[in-house]
C-alpha cells in the first residue's frame, strides 16, 4: 500500500473519531444544560403561604408601573408587604390565599383555603363583624373575608376561619333538617298499635284536637298543652305511638286559620315531625348542647310560622334533662335544663309547637320539666294486661299465615298469651327481695312487653321457616310451635336475670326498688 493510501485511511479514521467526539461533546453539553436547569430549580427559594387582609396602598407611576402594598397574615405575623408589579392589586380580595417570595414580596394570589377550623356565630354586629365561639366557648371577634362581605350570616351559623383566627373565609351550609326531621313519613299508624287504645286516645286528644278544632279551643279559651310525656318500662310502644303521631300529622287537614272549618287548601296543610334522640344532643364542648337545643326550637318556630302543626319528639328524655344536682352524671344538665325550659316557656312564642318526650326513667327527669304548664300531659305506657297482649299478638298472628285447617289466628293468640301469663312454676323467673325485706316470686308475665310478644311470635315463625326448608312444604304455625317459642324466651329471660343489677333493673322496668334477686334453678 502506498503512502498516499495510508494517509487517506488514517484521515478517515481520524474523521470518524472526530465525529464521535463531537457527538459526545454535544451530549455532554445537553446533560450539563439539563443539570444546570435542575440545579437552578432546586436552588429556588420556597414561597410562603399567607392570608390576604386588605390592600394597604396602590399607585401607578408615569411609566404605567404599579406600586402597591398589601396587609397580610402569615402564621401569627401581621405584615404589610410589597405587591409584585405583575399582580393586579385591584383583584386582591380579603381572605384569599397569597404567596410571598423570599423577600416577602406578594407574587401570586390563589383561591381561598377550603379547610380550617369551624366556629359557630354567636352574634352578628351592625358593622358586619362576627363574634364567634371557640371550642371552649370563649368569644372571639373576627372580620369577614371578601367572599362573605354581603353574605347573610345569622346567629348559630357555622363558618370556617383562617389559621390566624381573624377572618371568616367561608360559610358552611346550615345543619340541615335531615338530622332532625324525619325525611320519610313513618309507615306506622294508630291502627298498627294493639292494646293501647286508652293511651292512643289521650295522645290524640292532646296532639290532634288542638289543630283540627282550633276555633273551638279559642271559643273555650283553652290553650293546647305545650308538651306530652310518654313514660313507662321499655318495649311497650312509646316510640311506636310517636311514629303514629308523625304519620297522622303528615296526613294533613288542619284548621290553620282558626275559622272552625277545613278548607280545600287546608287539606294540604301538613304537620312537621322533628325527631331528636336525647343522647345526640350531649356534647363535651361548653355551650354546644345548648346551641343544638336552640337550633331545634328555631327550626320548630320557622316551620310553625305558617300555621303548620309541629311536634318535637325527644326520645330518651331522661338522658338529656336529668335532675340538676343529682350527682348521677356530669354537671352538663345545670345549663341544658334551663336552656330547654327557656325555649319551652320563654319570651318567644311556641304557637303550633308541641313537645313529646319519651323516657324509661321518669324519676331521673328534672321536676321543673314535669310541672304543669310545660309537659302538661303525662301518659304511662305500662305493661300489657292479658286482653291487651292478645290484641298485640293479633297484629302478628293473622289468618293469612300458614295455619292448621280450622284453626283461628285469634284463638292461637289467646293460647299463646295464656301460656305467657301463666303463674305456674314453669314460668317462674326468680324471687326478688323488696326494700322491706319481703320476698316474692317474679314470673314471665311480670316482665312481658309488647316487644317481647312480637319477639316470641317471630321465634315461632323462624322455627316454621326452618322446618319448611327441611321438609320442602309450608309448615303450619301450631300450638306446640308457639309453646316452644315461649319456652325459649322464658329460658333466655331467666338466664339474663342472674347478671342484672337489682336496683337499676327494677327502676328501668318501672318496678318497686329491689334489693336482691334469687334466680330459679
From Swiss-Prot:
Q: Which residues form a coiled coil?
A: 4-44
Q: SUPFAM superfamilies attached here?
A: P-loop containing nucleoside triphosphate hydrolases (SSF52540)
Q: Which GO terms describe its molecular function?
A: ATP binding; ATP hydrolysis activity
Sorted UniProt keywords: ATP-binding, Coiled coil, Nucleotide-binding
One Gene Ontology biological process: modification-dependent protein catabolic process
Q: Which residues bind ATP?
A: 235-240
**Ligase is among the record's keywords:** no
Domain of life here? Bacteria
Q: Which GO terms describe its cellular component?
A: proteasome complex
Its quaternary structure?
Answer: Homohexamer. Assembles into a hexameric ring structure.
As for family, the record states:
Belongs to the AAA ATPase family.
> What is the designated name of this protein?
AAA ATPase forming ring-shaped complexes
The record lists the organism as: Bifidobacterium longum (strain DJO10A)
